[in-house]
Amino acid sequence: MMASRRWDILTALLALAVLVVVAYSLLVQGQRLHVAASTGRMSRAMSAGTDARLTGAYRFTRGGWTYVHLEGSPEQIGFQHGYLLAPEIADAFAAVKLDDTHSTKKDWAFFQHAAHDMLWPHIEAEYQAELKGITDGLNAHGVKMTLDDVVALNAFEELPDYYVPWYDKRHKTKKAESVADLKVLGHCSAFVATGSWTKDGQIVMAHNNWTNYMVGERWRVMFDIVPQHGYRMIMDGFPGVITSDDDFGINSDGLMVTETTISDFHGWDPDGIPEFVRSRKALQYGTSIDDYVKIMLDGNNGGYANDWLLGDRKTGEIAQFELGLRAHKVWRTKNGYYVGSNFTSDPEVQKLDTTYNLDDPTESPNARHVRWDELIKENKGKIDVQLAEKFEGDHFDAYTKKDGPDVRTLCGHGDDSPKGDKGWGVKPYDPMGAVQGKVTDSKMAEQMSLVAHTGHPCGEVFHAKPFLAAHPEYNWQAPELRDMTSDPWTTFHSGEHSGD
């Protein structure tokens, strides 16, 4: 009896020992498999990370922005851009593709052909190399986009709104739902001031970017670029695009640049140089206001026509450069201000390049023009970076004389506008408006620094799901429209790292 019980206990202990050994073996094997898998992932990451083209490049996020440092040859800068921002570029590309094809009623192949046959031959070698580099970087990161896709993405401001109307007129086609679908909308509210108009007599420059929320929510990249040739640049930008494109940038020789779009612009030169190339080149190589103007005029294709607001930190001079296709004009001063809200100032540009109605006070560009003049004049001698931040979030409607966000306020909210804007063809409650803001002054520009704000500069947050439930007419945007958060004003400077 006792022997039998001892045998049972021994058998149980042996069985338990076997279970322990088996469990341990499985655990060790699992750990080895996990380590092997992790090592494989790390090895692949390290293999990509040691690509010579990535030398010196890095990224980090802060204040809602993705800061990207790029340096080297055009091929290196492009590869770094494409590789480090691959997820953001793929995401942004999906939104742009949906927006462009919906608004023009043309398939994406149309834009690919335009990029390949019309734009590419007029892009100089330096920027062709950079665009090829972006494509290579994307492909190396597993994002399958072609060079034609990347070029068309870079031209997402000029192809649908400038080339397509010209193309349709030339080919006597009209596939858009209405003429309004192909009107050039206004983008942005901006100003530049200097001399007795600012607190310290230095240049102050500010800008908020207007676009639809679907695309604009993705406009959250801060580029710090050290090119092989030309000047260092810090600028805000869109994933995959080689220029700022909204625009706000500083170069290391003291040039300060921003702009606002000319409303209802008409014109296109298929033999010209793409605007995204000219604006990048002008910021990279411009040493003065004169240089900037010269580079932008050279090969002007009429794409993304803007009123450029410029500053030269070295001299304290500012300028307004109104660039149409058939006409242009430059104003400059060392004691004054210029504002932009998508209106024209030169009668020749108004006559030859646009059909926008400057006399309708109900329309957004005209109402914002009035508000800009009010704010600047009321604050003469007090304007600084902090005041400029407040200006960019302003909600006073100069037409209704009431405070509240809508499509006529400097901080635009199309989704809060029951009537939209007839001059632009903006429909009621259109999810568009101010999507981010930037400010700098001469002292900050000397340090290659600026402050930037993601989302509405006023701080309000846009929520996509309840908006679409209330306005199902915009459900076509549902695959790509998402919440647009608002982060605090954040300071960035050239050459910084995440811990700075």
Task: Write out the residue ranges for each language-model feature.
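Flexible, small-residue-rich N-terminal segments that precede or flank a structured functional core
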Residues: 347, 352-354
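N-terminal Sec-pathway targeting helices
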Residues: 2-15
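N-terminal mature-domain region immediately after signal-peptide cleavage
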Residues: 23-290, 297-303, 309-332, 340, ...
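Hydrophobic membrane-insertion alpha-helices, especially the h-region
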Residues: 12-24
